[in-house]
Design a protein with these regions (language model features):
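Bacterial N-terminal signal peptides
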Residues: 5-16
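Conserved, structured core segments of small domains
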Residues: 21-157
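N-terminal secretory signal peptides that target proteins for export/translocation
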Residues: 1-2
């Protein structure tokens, strides 16, 4: 019995380096693109920090008319400016009405930086919407959304 135990122990010790090598090989991603990861600001898990901004109905909604149209034109221009600067990963409206109007996923690490960007948006300046800020840790691949989105619509942004 001792001999069987000793043989099993020796075999398991001999197999340990092989198992470790297999585990390391399995942990290496054959699709990993170091240059892309660096470009997108990815950490070792392929993730990065963002701030999720939820835009809610504000205290001063503007009535339909030229002032409201101009405000929203400025809002969309601000979205494009943030995307062009690489500061906006995702933006869009919530469907179905209600208090929640839209969202931004800003590619900044702190709420303070997000607040500084959002406070330049006409819908926030005018009080049409107010913003809630939530730190978010998500895939760095979100940074590709603006690049891909431009290729999906035949209309200019």
């Amino acid at each position: 019995m001792f001999r069987s135990l000793a043989i099993c122990t020796l075999l398991s010790l001999a197999a340990a380096p092989l198992q470790a090598a297999e585990a390391q090989a399995a942990a290496t991603n054959p699709h990993f693109d170091a240059a892309l990861a660096q470009q997108l600001g990815a950490d070792a898990q392929g993730m990065r920090r963002y701030v999720l901004v939820v835009l809610k109905t504000g205290p001063k909604p503007l009535p339909k008319g030229p002032a409201r149209d101009a405000m929203f034109k400025g809002h969309f221009a601000n979205i494009n400016k943030l995307a062009d600067a690489g500061q906006l990963a995702v933006a869009g409206p919530f469907m179905g009405g209600g208090e929640w109007r839209g969202l931004f996923v800003l590619a900044v690490p702190t709420v303070e930086e997000a607040r500084a960007l959002v406070e330049t948006d006409p819908v926030v300046i005018e009080g049409e919407m107010v913003a809630e800020y939530h730190p978010l840790y998500s895939s760095a691949a979100l940074m590709q959304v603006p690049v891909l989105h431009r290729r999906l619509s035949p209309q200019a942004p």
